[in-house]
From Swiss-Prot:
Gene: mukE
Assembly and oligomerization: Interacts, and probably forms a ternary complex, with MukF and MukB. The complex formation is stimulated by calcium or magnesium.
Lineage start: Bacteria, Pseudomonadati, Pseudomonadota, Gammaproteobacteria, Pasteurellales
GO biological process: cell division; chromosome condensation; chromosome segregation; DNA replication
GO terms under cellular component: cytoplasm; nucleoid
Family, as annotated: Belongs to the MukE family.
Acidic residues: bias regions: 227-241
Locations listed in the record: Cytoplasm, Nucleoid
InterPro entries linked: MukE_C, MukE_N, Scp_MukE
Region (Disordered): 207-241
Principal location class: cytoplasm
Protein name as annotated: Chromosome partition protein MukE
HAMAP family: MukE
């Protein structure tokens, strides 16, 4: 029996699956979470068994990717047997802003700590406020209520990205303070080779904002699978709980 299993499952893969860290790491990856070096044990586990686990996940038509910045995540193919991870247009835009902030001088000045309010303010500063408001309400008049709704959607987007391992809460859960992980570079692949990374990311934000207000407002129909998102990132444009 054991000999037959060894023929079917390579020894190192069997060791990976038997590792006590595997169930939690597997669950996180399948939910769309990104695992970076800040997760010491989980990251070391993935680094040690990267090739074996990639072979394991390919049976489900997904790939275990290690990005140039070091973090791990699963990228599904069109025929994936694992539920696809998706993001709305607005969540992708907020992700681009987070990447922009990660590259900013303020990150060092503020010891890497940002707030949801800063994300909201930066989004309004970099993108067209009127288009963003119309994404919340097509008949937006720029009222305080419309701005409040937009702020709520931005906060929800930040929380979604937190669950995906893009940011990490600082202090109390509801403090609104967080640090930004390198995994936000999923939203800025183009900046890896740009002469000026921050300017390149600014272009990505403006390109994303340049999408029609209709595409931003139709969040339910605007979601894309993770593989499509990766293609858009590579082209210079831009998961499930």
């Amino acid at each position: 029996m054991n000999e037959n299993l060894q023929e079917l499952i390579p020894t190192k893969l069997a060791a990976a699956i038997a590792n006590p860290l595997f169930p939690a790491v597997d669950s996180q990856l399948r939910s769309g979470r990104h695992i970076g070096q800040e997760y010491l044990d989980n990251f070391a586990f993935l680094a040690d068994f990267q090739n074996e686990l990639d072979m394991f996940y390919r049976r489900y038509n997904v790939e275990l990717i290690r990005a140039p910045e070091g973090f791990f995540y699963l990228r599904p193919k069109a025929t994936t047997l694992i539920a696809r991870s998706v993001l709305s247009e607005l969540e992708m835009l907020v992700g681009k802003v987070l990447c922009y902030l990660y590259l900013s001088p303020e990150r060092l000045a503020q010891q890497g700590i940002f707030s949801v309010q800063e994300v909201y303010d930066e989004l309004l500063n970099l993108a067209d406020e009127s288009k963003l408001l119309k994404a919340v309400n097509q008949r937006s008049s720029g009222s305080d209520l419309d701005k409040q709704k937009l702020a709520e959607k931005v906060r929800a987007a930040v929380n979604r990205l937190r669950r995906l391992g893009m940011i990490h809460t600082v202090g109390e859960q509801n403090s609104g303070k967080f640090t930004i992980s390198e995994s936000v570079f999923r939203f800025g692949a183009e900046v890896r080779s740009g002469d000026d990374p921050r300017e390149a990311q600014l272009r990505l934000i403006r390109d994303g904002e340049a999408a029609t207000p209709d595409s931003l407002s139709q969040e339910k129909s605007a979601v894309k699978n993770d593989e499509e998102i990766e293609d858009e990132l590579d082209e210079g444009l831009g998961e499930e709980e």
